[in-house]
A protein has these predicted regions:
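N-terminal Rossmann-like NAD(P)+-binding domain of SDR-like oxidoreductases, especially those catalyzing
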Residues: 1-183
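Alpha-helical substrate-binding/gating segment
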Residues: 169, 195-196
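Substrate-binding strand-loop-helix patch
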Residues: 184-195
Length: 196
């Protein structure tokens, strides 16, 4: 059984669809926030549901609601958690920094804590290429992070990596972070450069 957070987002919906042959049960959660078109998010969910049928269950939940999160874990007994939930968008973080701290840091902390409590075997979480900051040595690799993010969004993602590392060390959780660069394709986010 797999939990996918941020399942109505571009990467989240595609991830759910790609899990069709791997898992018999996929639970997806998302806040359906209004950062960009909720209609687009619902269309993605409809596409996921059409592809996966009864294998997929959607729940509208915010990671900041730890009580609801715990109930989902109690009910579902997950083997793997794929965390793709986040307040996205580098530019938007300048206008609404509080949303980034609440969702990307506090929400991720709640998810980690619940994963620890329920002894989740594997956690895969989205990070971002923005954690590299102004790094000029190419090609980039995971060992080149200088901990000098130049935007708040990047700082929240770097914070997630640090919390994940601490939880991995303290509680023997297996956590992998994926530092996505610009991800694009059909059903992509309308605020991305390619769609403007």
């Amino acid at each position: 059984k797999i939990l996918v957070t941020g399942c109505a987002g571009f990467i989240g919906a595609e991830t759910c669809c790609s899990l069709e042959k791997i898992s018999s049960k996929i639970v997806g959660i998302d806040t359906l926030n209004k950062y960009y078109s909720v209609k687009l998010k619902k269309l993605r969910l409809k596409r996921v549901k059409n592809k996966l049928g009864k294998k997929f269950k959607f729940l509208q939940v915010n990671l900041n609601n730890k009580k609801k999160l715990r109930k989902i874990f109690l009910k579902s007994k997950f083997d793997v958690v794929i965390n793709l939930a986040a307040q996205a968008g580098v530019r938007y973080s300048l206008k609404n920094p509080k949303s980034y701290v609440e969702n990307n840091i506090n929400g991720f902390f709640n998810l980690l804590d619940v994963c620890k409590e329920f002894k989740i075997k594997q956690i895969i979480s989205a990070s971002s290429s923005s954690v590299y900051g102004e790094e000029k040595n190419f090609p980039l690799n995971e060992n080149i992070c200088k901990n000098k993010p130049i935007q708040l969004y990047a700082a929240t993602k770097l914070s997630n990596e640090a919390m994940g590392y601490a939880y991995s060390s303290l509680y023997n959780l297996r956590i992998v972070f994926l530092r996505f660069f610009t991800v694009y394709g059909p059903w992509g986010r309308p605020d991305m450069f390619l769609f403007k």
